Regions:
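Bacterial Sec-dependent N-terminal signal peptides
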Residues: 1-22
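Short, ordered, surface-exposed loop/turn motifs in non-cytosolic proteins
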Residues: 22-24, 29-44, 61
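N-terminal active-site segment of His-dependent metallophosphoesterases
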Residues: 23, 30-31, 80-170
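Short, acidic Ser/Thr/Gly-rich low-complexity loop/linker segments typical of extracellular
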Residues: 44-60
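Extended active-site neighborhood of metal-dependent phosphoesterases/phosphodiesterases
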Residues: 72-76, 81-94, 99, 168-285, ...
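Active-site glycine-centered loops adjacent to acidic/histidine catalytic or metal-binding residues
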Residues: 120, 161-162, 197-198, 296, ...
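The substrate-binding groove and active-site-proximal loops of carbohydrate-active enzymes
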Residues: 121-122, 127-133, 163-172, 260-271, ...
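Short acidic, glycine-rich surface-loop motifs adjacent to enzyme active sites
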Residues: 282-303
Length: 394
């Protein structure tokens, strides 16, 4: 009897510890039925749902969210018509507090669609940028959506970083929160999967060992996780944050704009935490499936001799994550020019650097009436037509 009581006590204690360890749980369902095999993550660990659509995650809650990788054949609710609800904020920072977060999917079997890829909107409440953005980019998105609908194709979009301009967050009172509000007011017409850029980090955060994490807090609070994945059709999309924000102390005698603490400088790299998450994410992906890697700074660039070189500090480590994959596309912004690169070292990888929505920070349009990037290419975006695992771009 004593042995039985000891066994029961030990079992109960073990079960309690297990429940405490798995402090974020929930379900992923469609029409009330569980969806199995859906990747769920806190940005550090990746788990998948069981046959009943249930998941259990052990998390330190450091990132403050939980998200799913939207699976093929499904979509999620779009808040305000454009904001995909694939993530949820955690409600309590205490690790010992258990939380339940459920996700609902809608069946959407389309493997064919249009993806509009823009970059560098740089909205900052200056020189009429928001009006030009609405009359130009938003109007173009509406046109693209209508044209795609004629072929019964859904339309998605992404903006590859620098949605805002950190130098004017406080001087012009225009932060990421204002950007998201503007998209609501302008009726952004298609789902938007955003990417963080260097100008989307909070310049008021002082330089420290934790600057990069703290400077991205507003992004994580009001936009979405700064790295995640999703699966429209037969293509796997990965969004990465390749900005390691430093914001070093200003040199003596140099002054910054209102609210800006430091130099707003950064390193171009993907953190080890993201690399570890990415390897877990890709382990769930068929290597025959095309992968599109979305980030702000190009991983590969072209020099004056038209030779391709790696531009991230740890580009080799990042590229190694895609060993064995056959068809990998990197898409990026940041440069305000337009180019494609084929790194000879990685024949399965192609870089697409997309010209800026704002052209040359909205200045050429203001001065000349023509929005033109620094290489002479027009302001705009790239339109990708995806049919199954076939991708065409313009």
């Amino acid at each position: 009897m004593i042995r039985q009581l000891i066994f029961i006590s030990v079992f109960a204690a073990t079960a309690a510890m297990a429940a405490l360890a798995q402090n974020v749980t929930g379900t992923v369902t469609c029409g009330g039925a569980g969806v199995s095999g859906v990747a769920v993550s806190d940005g550090i660990n990746v788990v998948t749902t069981d046959k009943q659509g249930r998941y259990a995650l052990q998390t330190d809650k450091a990132n403050g969210y939980v998200f799913i990788s939207i699976p093929r054949g499904y979509t999620v609710d779009m808040a305000d018509g454009f904001n995909p609800q694939f993530w949820q904020k955690l409600s309590d920072a205490k690790v010992e507090t258990a939380e339940v977060h459920n996700f609902k999917l809608t069946y959407s079997p389309a493997d064919d669609y249009v993806m509009i890829i823009g970059a560098d909107s740089h909205l900052a409440r200056r020189i009429g940028d928001r009006k030009t953005y609405k009359n130009g980019y938003i109007a173009s998105l509406k046109y693209e959506k209508e044209k795609a609908a004629e072929s019964q194709l859904p339309t998605y979009s992404m903006i590859l970083g620098d949605l805002t301009w950190d130098n004017f967050w406080y001087a012009n009172k225009y932060t990421l929160r204002n950007f998201m509000d503007d998209q609501r007011k302008m009726h952004y017409p298609v789902p938007l999967f955003p990417v963080i850029g260097n100008h989307d980090n909070d310049p008021a955060v002082p330089h420290s060992a934790n600057t990069d994490f703290l400077a991205a807090k507003l992004w994580r609070d009001v936009v979405c996780p700064n790295y995640y994945s999703y699966n429209p059709g037969k293509v796997h999309y990965v969004v990465l944050d390749n900005i390691v924000y430093q914001n070093d102390t200003l040199p003596a005698g140099k002054k910054a704009r209102k609210g800006v603490w430091g130099q707003r400088n950064y390193n171009a790299a993907v953190t080890e935490q993201q690399i570890n998450w990415l390897r877990q994410d890709l382990a769930l992906v068929d290597k025959q499936m095309p992968v599109v890697v979305c980030s702000h700074i190009p991983t590969f660039r072209i020099n004056r001799n038209f030779s391709t070189f790696g531009s991230l500090q740890n580009y080799k480590e990042l590229a190694s994550c895609f060993d064995g994959f056959k068809n990998v596309h990197f898409v990026s912004g940041h440069t305000h020019v337009n180019f494609n690169a084929h790194p000879s070292e990685y024949p399965h990888i192609m870089e697409h650097n997309i010209a800026a929505i704002c052209a040359s920070w909205w200045i050429t349009g203001k001065l000349t009436g023509t929005d033109m990037c620094t290489d002479g290419s027009p302001a705009g975006y790239s339109r990708w037509t995806v049919r199954g695992d076939s991708i065409e771009w313009k």
